[in-house]
């Protein structure tokens, strides 16, 4: 990765023919590739060494010059420069075209840029380019105007002449007829014969008239066409055009093909066109105005940049370097070649044939056909299949063109620039390593040796085990004994990165210190499985090796697993004891009545352990034990005279004493049963109180204790543990009677089918719940299944209910709940019919999961793309704005409680304004951090809501500021400058995506209030894409009174505004559930019926702030309904990006165009500038964009092109001559620079390291420490390998 900060911009533009020739090292004239006998490139062909460079390093084509000493010489015999062969990856050639061709991206893209510029419909443009119509490129209006009377007179003369000729011909026919009639009369002919003669004469006359009229009409048509001829007119009638050219060729010019487009562009006045369009926009309406706006964008793009519209027509085509379109020999002597070579060959063949035809002076029709074929060949080279049928190769496969090389997952952007593969990596199956510490992983010896090979070889040479690197390599390959000792030494404190695919969030890659293990499997610490979502059923993981000292320091400080205990999405611990460990700790901390040793008192823990060993005291029996270093817990009643720090006699169990020994010494005594919930709260509390190293140590202790006691808990499962409740038959009987009654009412026609279904579902749901409760009551506390589920180690009550109680209601393939339940449990066994209906749900579940994974992955990708440039750029933007969030809720019974979502709304933020109690005493200043303690304090003081900073109100010009973001949830500290909070937000929202359901829940086919409520993942996508939901619920546009109009045909809600304006009527479906009644008063933006609201309507009626709130609340509603906790700030980051743009309505005196989408910051800047100069500011409307659209609308063309619609983005960017400011992450990854986030920021890189006094003293006293150290260039990267990574927290880098 280069860290060249001089590269500040990346510009794209239209290449002119001269630029293409400037890039080129020579013209490719022949379609040949390589000689079939010598296998060497053909001269002037597509692989020519003279143009592209030698195929062998330092060797010319003919072999006259070999070796590096001739570097730079151009061989006089073969013309090849003696240089490295790798120049064949860089040097371009070109094809000089015999006729210009248009660039298909600008003509065929949507919208057609050429069409907009020339004001031609794409259909007409196509006719011109592909030689189906002539285009008038210039008209000499003045000359035509001057000569019009003469030309009119000439036409009139010609018409008169035609009329005279017609009349003369008719008279001649009439004379002949008279003569013939007279002759027939003389001969005594019959009347029939005369009639025949007359008819024949009439026919002749009619033909003469018709022919003459046709000629006169044609003449008039030619004249009218010429008289009204203007530039840009098309003429598809070849004969008519020829006639015009013959008669009036000196007054106009016209042509076909790309040449006519080129001529037109050469004379095109951009400034005049822009002025005319602005005029149209100011005065026009409707369709005309819209089209003028769109055209102005294109015209303006050429006016305001150095781009020339002529760049859209090509006179030369660049030929990319041969190594990028290689030709390789296969085993059978055949060749595999890149499709581009075929496409280039077609272009060269057609171009050469066209040159030959032009030299021969071939007829125009043949030349035009060849030009059309050349145009098509260049089209298919640039974008095969964009127009007409694609060019296919063998097996009818469409060939991959230059556009296809960039597009899609396999394209250049996503495959090579954003998805590079790395060396120093390996992968293997994972197995559990319960003996490891949290920061360790077990690395198989062979794998470690391969990964650390260069380090081992260097060390072998340093220790004189080998004379040189070559012999060291041989030693490593032969697994000599010394190698293993050196390997042990080399891997000490050199972290490795472990990664498990799919990497859904940043905890999917973590650093560990490797421990060498036998076998071929990587050993993974059991507590990090949650973060990786790993299990040991055959999962594989990849290992990567950070090489440079900087990379190692980053891995150790930022990525070490013991520093990543908290989840970035909600700040909860993710390294939690699970399964076996929970069972062990639960077993350890439960209390049992009547066990051995109950009520005894012991003088010390040691004595109690001894009693346990001898069988006198059971682990779970209540007893009194004298404890040293006892830290009391809340609610412990201290005996009289007891002082903190003194020993205390505590009533507890030996198990709980052992459990507390795993916790830090100064942690309050824990007298609770250690189930999953309690352990989570415990680790959460530890993370709040102690540094991460201490928490990691405690977690390891808990893990060891958990495994140890799990193996002694005797948890097994037997069929006898699955006890069906004896009350089940009686319960079922009662509910069956109710169901029969409902069925009877239906049979009699008292209720309809929907009511029957809903009643039955209700009845059987109650029955299921009652059986489940009976089953739970029936289970003994010692029952192992009960212990497993109660402790949270495995399974849930629903699963137990299905095994031991009742299977209950299931869904059919449509997703509707069937009103017939499965009455058996798995323990009792299902009947055939029950088994059959149960299979539907199971199959749908599996299909669902597969779909969900793909959809969730795509959602994450779009979220990352839209938010990747949201980086913390400054410590405080000094804004006074913020959000008001509730601290407390009032329950249904009227009791005030702490808001249940406070952890994911207020926690971890910064106060925007000071908080005072009722007496006006300030409890917290603005800028205070909302920690758990602070929230408790404010709640206790009776504060019900607080104003906090939020990224939604942040005023940083680029990225966001640390104060508006608040705490980084992963570290529990205020977020660092440089933190990529956008990507963290995207990962936090995308990672639980797979847990969300795909279905739209059906309430058993019952017509619910608003059809089927879209839930789960589809709802999240609908919100983030800002789509109008299906069956949208209306919201009131004004404040007023409700009047409900219920007619036979429809149901309408009418709002009568308070201010007496026109009424608003909202037609609603009959089955919709109304939220308002007749006569109610509604406020602006109040929802009128249940259902999903259109966020665009919320924005229009209630404004951006309410739209943001609505989106955040709706997204959180979906996640909370699934029991997934995500902090609001992550959703806010995404919503901020969706509402970042403004559509310009009035441009005022600014440079902004009406209808243009601009960034809020740019809009405000332009307006400030205009107001400062006393000009009119622009007016704009905030725009809510879906995440896909917002990603494509980013200022960075590199980022947008690598996301979706690559060709469209590049076409637009090149036309506008866009510059990419390289502020986001993707752009910098693409061009190979360090990302401007985290440790890639300049402030962390421009640091001078100076040795301290101690280090200097060490240098003089112990030369060995700095044996390899020099201030020479090669060691500028950092100190030698003996030095450990230094925690970056100890340094003050200035600025925060």
Swiss-Prot record:
<dbReference type="GO" id="GO:0006351">
    <property type="term" value="P:DNA-templated transcription"/>
</dbReference>
<keyword id="KW-0804">Transcription</keyword>
<dbReference type="InterPro" id="IPR007083">
    <property type="entry name" value="RNA_pol_Rpb1_4"/>
</dbReference>
<dbReference type="InterPro" id="IPR007080">
    <property type="entry name" value="RNA_pol_Rpb1_1"/>
</dbReference>
<feature type="binding site">
    <location>
        <position position="62"/>
    </location>
    <ligand>
        <name>Zn(2+) 1</name>
    </ligand>
</feature>
<comment type="function">
    <text>DNA-dependent RNA polymerase catalyzes the transcription of DNA into RNA using the four ribonucleoside triphosphates as substrates.</text>
</comment>
<dbReference type="Pfam" id="PF00623">
    <property type="entry name" value="RNA_pol_Rpb1_2"/>
</dbReference>
<dbReference type="InterPro" id="IPR007081">
    <property type="entry name" value="RNA_pol_Rpb1_5"/>
</dbReference>
<comment type="similarity">
    <text>Belongs to the RNA polymerase beta' chain family.</text>
</comment>
<dbReference type="InterPro" id="IPR000722">
    <property type="entry name" value="RNA_pol_asu"/>
</dbReference>
<feature type="binding site">
    <location>
        <position position="537"/>
    </location>
    <ligand>
        <name>Mg(2+)</name>
    </ligand>
</feature>
<keyword id="KW-0240">DNA-directed RNA polymerase</keyword>
<dbReference type="GO" id="GO:0000428">
    <property type="term" value="C:DNA-directed RNA polymerase complex"/>
</dbReference>
<dbReference type="InterPro" id="IPR038120">
    <property type="entry name" value="Rpb1_funnel_sf"/>
</dbReference>
<dbReference type="InterPro" id="IPR042102">
    <property type="entry name" value="RNA_pol_Rpb1_3_sf"/>
</dbReference>
<dbReference type="InterPro" id="IPR012754">
    <property type="entry name" value="DNA-dir_RpoC_beta_prime_bact"/>
</dbReference>
<dbReference type="InterPro" id="IPR045867">
    <property type="entry name" value="DNA-dir_RpoC_beta_prime"/>
</dbReference>
<feature type="binding site">
    <location>
        <position position="75"/>
    </location>
    <ligand>
        <name>Zn(2+) 1</name>
    </ligand>
</feature>
<feature type="binding site">
    <location>
        <position position="964"/>
    </location>
    <ligand>
        <name>Zn(2+) 2</name>
    </ligand>
</feature>
<dbReference type="GO" id="GO:0000287">
    <property type="term" value="F:magnesium ion binding"/>
</dbReference>
<dbReference type="GO" id="GO:0003899">
    <property type="term" value="F:DNA-directed RNA polymerase activity"/>
</dbReference>
<feature type="binding site">
    <location>
        <position position="535"/>
    </location>
    <ligand>
        <name>Mg(2+)</name>
    </ligand>
</feature>
<dbReference type="InterPro" id="IPR044893">
    <property type="entry name" value="RNA_pol_Rpb1_clamp_domain"/>
</dbReference>
<dbReference type="GO" id="GO:0003677">
    <property type="term" value="F:DNA binding"/>
</dbReference>
<dbReference type="Pfam" id="PF04998">
    <property type="entry name" value="RNA_pol_Rpb1_5"/>
</dbReference>
<keyword id="KW-0479">Metal-binding</keyword>
<feature type="binding site">
    <location>
        <position position="954"/>
    </location>
    <ligand>
        <name>Zn(2+) 2</name>
    </ligand>
</feature>
<feature type="compositionally biased region" description="Basic and acidic residues">
    <location>
        <begin position="185"/>
        <end position="202"/>
    </location>
</feature>
<dbReference type="Pfam" id="PF04997">
    <property type="entry name" value="RNA_pol_Rpb1_1"/>
</dbReference>
<protein>
    <recommendedName>
        <fullName>DNA-directed RNA polymerase subunit beta'</fullName>
        <ecNumber>2.7.7.6</ecNumber>
    </recommendedName>
</protein>
<feature type="binding site">
    <location>
        <position position="539"/>
    </location>
    <ligand>
        <name>Mg(2+)</name>
    </ligand>
</feature>
<keyword id="KW-0862">Zinc</keyword>
<dbReference type="InterPro" id="IPR007066">
    <property type="entry name" value="RNA_pol_Rpb1_3"/>
</dbReference>
<dbReference type="Pfam" id="PF05000">
    <property type="entry name" value="RNA_pol_Rpb1_4"/>
</dbReference>
<feature type="binding site">
    <location>
        <position position="961"/>
    </location>
    <ligand>
        <name>Zn(2+) 2</name>
    </ligand>
</feature>
<feature type="region of interest" description="Disordered">
    <location>
        <begin position="185"/>
        <end position="204"/>
    </location>
</feature>
<feature type="binding site">
    <location>
        <position position="78"/>
    </location>
    <ligand>
        <name>Zn(2+) 1</name>
    </ligand>
</feature>
<feature type="binding site">
    <location>
        <position position="60"/>
    </location>
    <ligand>
        <name>Zn(2+) 1</name>
    </ligand>
</feature>
<dbReference type="Pfam" id="PF04983">
    <property type="entry name" value="RNA_pol_Rpb1_3"/>
</dbReference>
<dbReference type="GO" id="GO:0008270">
    <property type="term" value="F:zinc ion binding"/>
</dbReference>
<keyword id="KW-0548">Nucleotidyltransferase</keyword>
<keyword id="KW-0460">Magnesium</keyword>
């Amino acid at each position: 990765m280069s860290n060249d900060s001089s590269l500040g911009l990346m510009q794209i533009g239209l290449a002119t023919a001269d630029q293409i020739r400037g890039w080129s090292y020579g013209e490719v004239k022949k379609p040949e590739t390589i000689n079939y006998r010598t296998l060497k490139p053909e001269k002037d062909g597509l692989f020519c060494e003279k143009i592209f460079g030698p195929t062998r390093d330092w060797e010319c084509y003919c072999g006259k010059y070999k070796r590096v000493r001739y570097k730079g010489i151009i061989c006089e015999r073969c013309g090849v420069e003696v240089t490295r062969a790798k120049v064949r990856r860089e040097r371009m050639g070109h094809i000089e075209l015999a006729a210009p061709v248009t660039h298909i991206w600008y003509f065929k893209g949507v919208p057609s840029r050429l069409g907009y510029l020339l004001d031609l419909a794409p259909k007409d443009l196509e006719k011109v380019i592909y030689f189906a119509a002539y285009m008038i490129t210039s008209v000499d209006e003045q000359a035509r105007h001057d000569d019009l009377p003469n030309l009119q007179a000439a036409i009139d003369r010609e018409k008169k002449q035609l009329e005279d000729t017609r009349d003369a011909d008719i008279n001649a026919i009439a004379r002949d007829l008279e003569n013939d009639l007279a002759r027939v009369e003389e001969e005594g002919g019959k009347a029939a014969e005369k009639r025949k003669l007359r008819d024949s004469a009439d026919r002749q006359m009619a033909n003469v008239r018709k022919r003459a009229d046709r000629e006169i009409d044609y003449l008039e048509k030619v004249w009218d066409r010429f008289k009204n001829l203007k530039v840009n007119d098309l003429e598809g009638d070849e004969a008519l055009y020829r006639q015009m050219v013959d008669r009036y060729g000196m007054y106009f010019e016209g042509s076909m093909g790309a040449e006519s487009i080129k001529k037109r562009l050469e004379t095109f006045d951009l400034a005049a066109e822009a002025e005319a369009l602005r005029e149209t926009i100011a005065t026009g309406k409707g369709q005309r105005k819209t089209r003028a706006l769109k055209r102005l964008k294109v015209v303006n793009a050429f006016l305001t940049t150095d781009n020339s519209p002529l760049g859209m027509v090509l006179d030369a085509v660049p030929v990319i370097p041969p190594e990028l379109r290689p030709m390789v020999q296969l085993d059978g002597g055949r060749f595999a070649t890149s499709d581009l070579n075929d496409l280039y060959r077609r272009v060269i063949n057609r171009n050469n044939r066209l040159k030959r035809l032009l030299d021969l002076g071939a007829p125009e029709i043949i030349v035009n056909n060849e030009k059309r074929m050349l145009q098509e060949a260049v089209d298919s080279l640039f974008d095969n299949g964009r127009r007409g049928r694609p060019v296919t190769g063998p097996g009818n496969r469409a060939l991959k063109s230059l556009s296809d090389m960039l597009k899609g997952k396999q394209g250049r952007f996503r495959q090579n620039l954003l998805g590079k593969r790395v060396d120093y990596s390996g992968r293997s199956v994972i197995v559990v390593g319960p003996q490891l510490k949290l920061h360790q992983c077990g690395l198989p010896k062979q794998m470690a040796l391969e990964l650390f090979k260069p380090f081992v070889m260097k060390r072998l040479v340093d220790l004189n085990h080998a004379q040189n690197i070559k012999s060291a390599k041989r030693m490593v390959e032969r697994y000599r004994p010394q190698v293993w000792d050196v390997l042990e030494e080399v891997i000490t404190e050199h972290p490795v990165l472990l990664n498990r695919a799919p990497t859904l969030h940043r905890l999917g890659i973590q650093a560990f210190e490797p421990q060498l293990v036998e076998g071929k499997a990587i050993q993974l610490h059991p507590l990090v499985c949650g973060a990786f979502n790993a299990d040991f059923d055959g999962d594989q993981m990849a290992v990567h090796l950070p090489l440079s000292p900087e990379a190692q320091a980053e891995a150790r400080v930022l990525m070490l697993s013991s520093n990543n205990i908290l989840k970035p999405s909600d700040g909860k611990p993710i390294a939690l004891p699970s399964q076996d460990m929970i069972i062990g700790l639960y077993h350890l901390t439960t209390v049992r009545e009547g066990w051995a040793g109950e009520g005894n008192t012991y003088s010390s823990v040691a004595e109690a352990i001894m009693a346990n060993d001898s069988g006198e005291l059971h682990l779970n029996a209540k007893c009194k034990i004298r404890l040293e270093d006892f830290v009391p817990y809340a609610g412990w009643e201290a005996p009289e005279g007891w002082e903190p720090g003194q020993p205390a006699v505590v009533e507890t169990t030996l198990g709980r004493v052992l459990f507390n020994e795993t916790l830090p010494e100064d942690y309050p005594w824990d007298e609770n049963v250690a189930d999953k919930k309690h352990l989570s709260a415990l680790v959460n509390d530890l993370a709040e109180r102690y540094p991460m190293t201490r928490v990691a140590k405690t977690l390891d202790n808990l893990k060891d204790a958990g495994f140890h006691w799990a193996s002694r808990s005797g948890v097994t499962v037997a069929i006898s543990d699955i006890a069906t409740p004896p009350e089940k038959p009686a319960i079922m009987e009662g509910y069956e009677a109710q169901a029969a009654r409902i069925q009877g009412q239906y049979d009699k026609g008292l209720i309809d089918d929907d009511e029957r279904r809903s009643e039955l579902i209700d009845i059987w749901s109650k029955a299921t719940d009652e059986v489940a409760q009976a089953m739970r009551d029936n289970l003994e506390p010692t029952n192992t299944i009960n212990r497993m589920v109660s402790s949270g180690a495995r399974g849930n009550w629903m699963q137990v209910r299905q095994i031991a109680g009742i299977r209950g209601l299931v869904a059919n393939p449509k997703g509707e709940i069937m009103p017939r339940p499965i009455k058996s449990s798995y323990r009792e066994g299902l009947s055939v019919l029950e088994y059959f209906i149960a299979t539907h749900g199971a199959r749908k579940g599996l299909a669902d999961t597969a779909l969900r994974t793909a959809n969730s992955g795509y959602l994450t990708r779009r979220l990352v793309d839209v938010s990747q440039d949201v980086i913390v750029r400054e410590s405080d933007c000094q804004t006074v704005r913020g959000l008001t969030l509730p601290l407390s809720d009032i329950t249904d019974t009227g009791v005030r409680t702490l808001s249940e979502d406070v952890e994911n709304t207020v926690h971890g933020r910064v106060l925007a304004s000071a908080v005072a109690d009722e007496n006006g005493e300030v409890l917290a200043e603005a800028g205070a951090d909302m920690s758990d303690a602070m929230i408790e304090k404010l709640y206790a003081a009776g504060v019900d809501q607080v104003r906090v900073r939020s990224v939604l109100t942040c005023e940083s010009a680029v990225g966001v500021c640390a104060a508006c973001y608040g705490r980084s949830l992963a570290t529990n500290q205020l977020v660092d400058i440089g933190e990529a909070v956008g990507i963290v937000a995207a990962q936090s929202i995308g990672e639980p995506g797979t847990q969300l359901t795909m279905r739209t829940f059906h309430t058993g086919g019952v017509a619910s209030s608003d059809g089927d409520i879209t839930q789960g993942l589809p709802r999240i996508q609908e919100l983030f894409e800002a789509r109008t939901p299906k069956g949208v619920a209306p919201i009131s546009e004004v404040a007023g009174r409700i009047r409900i109009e219920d007619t036979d045909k429809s149901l309408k809600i009418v709002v009568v505004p308070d201010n007496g304006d026109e009424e608003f009527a909202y037609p609603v479906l009959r089955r919709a559930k109304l939220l308002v009644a007749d006569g109610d008063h509604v406020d602006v933006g109040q929802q009128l019926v249940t259902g999903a609201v259109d966020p665009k309507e919320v924005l229009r009626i209630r404004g951006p702030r309410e739209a943001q709130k609505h989106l955040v609340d709706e997204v959180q509603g979906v996640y909370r309904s699934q029991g997934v906790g995500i902090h609001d700030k992550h959703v806010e980051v995404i919503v901020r990006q969706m509402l970042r743009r403004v559509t310009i309505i009035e441009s005022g005196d600014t440079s902004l165009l009406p209808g243009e989408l601009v960034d809020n910051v740019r809009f405000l800047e332009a307006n400030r500038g205009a107001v400062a100069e006393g000009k009119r500011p622009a007016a704009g409307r905030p725009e809510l964009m879906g995440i896909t659209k917002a990603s494509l609308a980013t200022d960075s063309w590199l980022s947008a092109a690598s996301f979706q619609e690559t060709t469209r983005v590049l076409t637009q960017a090149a036309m506008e001559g866009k510059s990419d400011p390289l502020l986001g992450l993707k752009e910098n990854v693409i061009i190979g620079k360090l990302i401007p986030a985290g440790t890639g920021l300049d402030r962390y890189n421009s640091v001078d390291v100076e040795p301290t006094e101690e280090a200097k003293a060490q240098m003089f006293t112990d030369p060995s420490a700095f044996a390899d150290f020099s201030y020479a260039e090669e060691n500028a990267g950092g100190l030698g390998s003996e030095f450990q990574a230094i925690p970056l927290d100890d340094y003050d880098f200035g600025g925060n």
